[in-house]
Regions:
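Surface-exposed, low-hydrophobicity interaction/linker segments
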Residues: 51, 57-124, 146
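Terminal targeting segments of Actinobacterial cell-envelope proteins
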Residues: 1-24
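Hydrophobic membrane-insertion alpha-helices, especially the h-region
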Residues: 27-44
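Helix-rich interaction surfaces within compact, conserved domain-sized segments
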Residues: 157-226
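Mid-length scaffold segments of soluble, non-membrane domains
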Residues: 112-168
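Ordered hydrophobic segments in well-structured contexts
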Residues: 88, 126, 133-137, 175-179, ...
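Hydrophobic, helix-length membrane anchors
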Residues: 45-50
Length: 226
């Protein structure tokens, strides 16, 4: 954890209960869905509790933030921690910081749309950010998720993410994914390493434009990794 250690946590989240036993071999269940005539992948991580985490605060929207000039967050490092460790972040949604490194589609995650029941958290997808991914996040407060039309926009974003050389080398169409994350001030967010764009609405083209700008940032040591 970097020098600004988390203190006075607001609404700390620890979603993996202590009484829950983790299966030895978590699996990624991939389903092929047809949404509005478009075939998309939907993923659910099963056999593993959601990654526990804690945030000192929620990142707040900035009126002048755009795709080209999103919120720049302080770099919290890229430390690898053991799966199941509670990871701590200065703000949520995090755009850097400690994360799991289990592999096998657990951390980093495979590029896909993850439905609201997927048992994942920042410690999973922050590893994707380190590898140059862009992650779209959606919120389901009190279980009230976005409408099917909006979820279709998120799936379209995943389906049409910009290609990169490393994505091709990794055997995927694009290094983007979408996942539920409730601990944020707006219904949606687009996240790259140290970059966050908080959104009240989600449009697939905005997500694609953000990804085109911020995928595979050259300063990332592991940007070519899968």
């Amino acid at each position: 954890m970097p020098s600004g250690r988390v203190v006075g946590r607001t609404r700390p989240i620890a979603t993996g209960s202590t009484g829950e036993r983790r299966l030895l071999s978590p699996a990624l269940l991939i389903a092929v869905l047809v949404v509005g005539g478009i075939v998309v992948l939907s993923a659910v991580l099963i056999g593993s509790p959601a990654s526990p985490y804690a945030c000192a605060s929620q990142l707040q929207p900035q009126a002048n933030a755009t795709v080209e000039n999103p919120i720049v967050t302080p770099d919290e490092g890229a430390g690898h921690v053991r799966t199941g460790t509670t990871t701590e972040y200065a703000s949520c949604p995090p755009a850097s910081g400690p994360h799991y490194t289990e592999g096998g589609g657990v951390a980093p995650l495979r590029p896909a749309f993850y439905d609201s029941g997927a048992r994942i958290g920042p410690a999973n997808w922050v590893h994707n950010l380190e590898h140059g991914y862009v992650v779209a996040l959606y919120r389901c407060p009190d279980g009230q998720c976005p409408s099917n039309d909006v979820l279709s926009e998120l799936r379209e974003f995943v389906l049409n993410g910009p290609p990169t050389e490393s994505a091709t080398a990794c055997g995927v169409s694009s290094k983007v994914l979408a996942a539920r994350f409730d601990d944020m001030a707006t219904p949606f967010a687009l996240v790259a390493w140290d970059r966050v764009l908080l959104l009240d609405t989600f449009d697939a083209q905005v997500g694609i434009d953000f990804a085109r700008r911020w995928l595979e940032q050259p300063e990332l040591a592991e940007r070519g990794s899968c």
